Amino acid sequence: MNSRERILTALDHREPDKVPFDLAGSTWTGITNGAYQNLLNHLGKNPEEPVWSDVVQQIVIPSEDILETLKVDTRGLFPLTSHNRDVYSKLTDSGDHWVYNDEWGFT
């Protein structure tokens, strides 16, 4: 059973070959940058530059290599919406973490 079939089977209230695995298919099932870098280290992979899903929450999008390694069944779509389309220009790297300053100057 492939990922698509697995998910559709589960959504149809039938039993798939295994429980579908979602990691970062949405912001709510995402992984923070710190946890992701720790995961990469645990798997013996090199650190990666973060690809942000939600900067304010420090949620990153895992690389396809990691998603395949972990056999994740889902892939997320993260369009830049009106609330976060300019978020990258408001980021500063302060060494061990990123700082986000919103339009009111709050971090």
Features from the language model and the residues they span:
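Catalytic cores of TIM-barrel enzymes
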Residues: 1-107
